[in-house]
């Protein structure tokens, strides 16, 4: 049922956000699928993007059994998630899906394992492509509703999309998937590190943040200088008692 609703929405844009401000901006820009973490920003994200489809991450390693995954999944859904992003094993995904929790799974590049594999496309050889595709079919059989396809060749992503019931969410694999996925820090230019080949920086917020930080520092320096030089506080910043009230006070404490 969830897959059918997703297909009818014909959504092409998805982004991962880190703050409620980013979520609000994405929502107002017309992005209808937003992924985020179940952290202290989440309730505000749900508030500022009331009708967006929220895919909320279940951090890898947060749960150690399928039963814990089910419990945590329901907790996140109760908070306002529409689906749970889960990169755990098939057993976890199958258990959650059987309980009716919509799952977004993952195939392809795993960034947090890049120290082992480097940042590279996955599935460029026939053998590796077959492994990725088999993983997709296993996730489909387990009951996942969506699958993020990350940094795989466009030909493989196209074949996967045409041969799975799941909604495919493509990142770094062309325009052949059901949705187009990019991180907000790539779109907004807030990434201080390496920008991958598939990323596109549309604006440069980082440089603006540097300008704002300089303004903050300048403001604090001016405050320090004023205090040292006796220029703050000025008379207009003071609260004073009427002279008769001051005299009355001093008489009372004698």
Residues covered by each model-derived region:
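Alpha-helix-loop-beta-strand connector modules within alpha/beta enzyme cores
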Residues: 7, 39-63, 90-117, 153-180
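C-terminal alpha-helical cap/extension of soluble enzyme domains
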Residues: 79-82, 166-254
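Electropositive phosphate-/nucleotide-binding environments in soluble metabolic enzymes
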Residues: 17-20, 28, 39, 63-70, ...
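Single conserved hydrophobic/aromatic residue that forms the stacking wall/gate
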Residues: 1-6, 10-11
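Flexible, glycine/proline-enriched loop segments at strand-loop-helix junctions
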Residues: 77-84, 120-124, 144-147, 206-211
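Active-site beta->alpha loop and helix N-cap motifs at the rims of alpha/beta catalytic domains
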Residues: 15-95, 99-104, 122
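Active-site/ligand-binding-proximal alpha/beta "capping" segment
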Residues: 98, 102, 125-165, 221-225
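Alpha-helical segments flanking ligand/cofactor-binding loops in enzyme cores
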Residues: 24, 43, 70, 74, ...
């Amino acid at each position: 049922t969830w897959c059918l609703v997703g297909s009818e929405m014909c959504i092409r844009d998805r982004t991962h956000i880190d703050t409620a401000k980013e979520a609000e901006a994405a929502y107002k820009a017309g992005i209808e699928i937003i992924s985020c973490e179940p952290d202290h920003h989440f309730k505000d994200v749900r508030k500022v993007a009331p009708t967006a489809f929220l895919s909320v991450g279940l951090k890898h390693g947060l749960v150690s059994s399928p039963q814990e995954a089910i419990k945590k999944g329901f907790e996140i859904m109760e908070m306002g998630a529409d689906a749970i992003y889960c990169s755990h094993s098939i057993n976890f995904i199958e258990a959650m899906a059987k309980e009716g929790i919509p799952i977004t799974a993952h195939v392809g590049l795993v960034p947090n394992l890049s120290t082992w594999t480097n940042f590279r496309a996955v599935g460029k050889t026939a053998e590796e492509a077959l492994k990725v595709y088999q993983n997709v079919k296993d996730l489909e059989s387990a009951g996942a509703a969506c699958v993020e396809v990350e940094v795989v060749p466009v030909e493989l992503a196209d074949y996967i999309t045409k041969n799975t019931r799941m909604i495919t969410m493509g990142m770094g694999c062309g325009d052949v998937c059901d949705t187009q996925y990019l991180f907000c820090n790539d779109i907004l230019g807030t990434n201080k590190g390496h920008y991958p080949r598939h990323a596109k920086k549309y604006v440069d917020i980082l440089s603006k943040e540097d300008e704002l930080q300089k303004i903050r520092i300048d403001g604090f320096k001016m405050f320090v200088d004023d205090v040292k030089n006796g220029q703050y506080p000025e008379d207009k910043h003071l609260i004073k008692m009427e002279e008769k009230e001051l005299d009355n006070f001093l008489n009372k404490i004698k």
